[in-house]
Amino acid sequence: MSYFKTAILLAGLTALFMGVGYLIGGASGAMIALVVAAATNIFAYWNSDKMVLSMYGAQQVDERSAPDLVRMVAGLAGNAQLPMPKVFIMDNPQPNAFATGRNPENAAVAVTTGLMQSLSREELAGVIAHELAHVKNHDTLLMTVTATIAGAVSMLAQFGMFFGGNRDNNNGGLGVIGSIAMMILAPIAAMLVQMAISRSREYAADDLGARICGQPTWLASALAKIENAAHQVPNYDAERAPATAHMFIINPLTGQGMDNLFATHPSTQNRIAALQQLATTLGIRAPQRAAAPARGLWGGAPRSRGPWG
């Protein structure tokens, strides 16, 4: 995702933010919203990654505390010709992962304990490679800033509902009606802006991630496991912050598996099919059997050789 497209997206969300401000306070409300949006954009550029990591209680690890995981990330980052990102672990039973950061030089990859406990080393490598593909494609800036701005739009919409909109403008009763419509439509509009870029971005990261780790079927197998678990193991942190759902490799929210207008991700079945087609195109045969789960990646598990280092 180019910086130009990022700027267009932020401009659209800023315009939506101003529109909500206008419904609350007329022209002065729109101007205040513009100032707040500009400040939020600047703050989000520099701090949104820290906010998201803190929101999920992610703890940074190094080669002493999580040697196998950090070495795996380092090896795959080398394959992708990327600087070594920071590595974080989230204490969450749902298998999932995301990447964040304003550029490859300031990137971070975060995985849940559930992911590390339920996937094989090969599957985990596929997931990490997918997240590094987001970093290489400069998707991480877009994902984190979008989550911050979309969350702000939703908060402002709720504020407008409680305070009843702008009753003193020339639109008469439209202020109350507008605030109700704003409460319903503004968060949806912000979500649709996120969804507009999410699907193609995930397909691109799947493709590049499979090439980074060297085996598309590893990622395909991981996606199937994560999708199945996401419907059974709730992610309460994500439920409290749905604006961040598009950042994860699989939608962490319950009941969102359909590939429809409001889905944060493409259909997992379609993603798996695309990866299987890529494996066929590259002439790569699927492994005979899956390896054992990658238990103990935060310290002490025996190392096995692989393309991750």
UniProtKB/Swiss-Prot annotation:
Family label: Belongs to the peptidase M48B family.
Protein name (Swiss-Prot/TrEMBL): Protease HtpX homolog
Cofactor: Zn(2+)
Record text on cofactor binding: Binds 1 zinc ion per subunit.
GO cellular component: plasma membrane
Top-rank lineage group of the source organism: Bacteria
Signal sequence coordinates: none
Pfam family, one: Peptidase_M48
Keywords: Cell inner membrane, Cell membrane, Hydrolase, Membrane, Metal-binding, Metalloprotease, Protease, Transmembrane, Transmembrane helix, Zinc
The gene coding this protein: htpX
Biological process annotations from GO: proteolysis
Keyword set includes Lipid biosynthesis: no
Subcellular location: Cell inner membrane
Binding-site list for Zn(2+): 130, 134, 202
One function term, GO molecular function aspect: metalloendopeptidase activity
InterPro entries associated with the record: HtpX_protease (IPR050083), Pept_M48_protease_HtpX (IPR022919), Peptidase_M48 (IPR001915)
Membrane topology recorded in Swiss-Prot or TrEMBL: Multi-pass membrane protein
Entry annotation: catalytic residues: 131
PANTHER family: PROTEASE HTPX (PTHR43221:SF1)
Transmembrane segments: 7-27, 28-48, 145-165, 173-193
Enzyme Commission (EC) number: 3.4.24.-
Top-level EC class: hydrolase
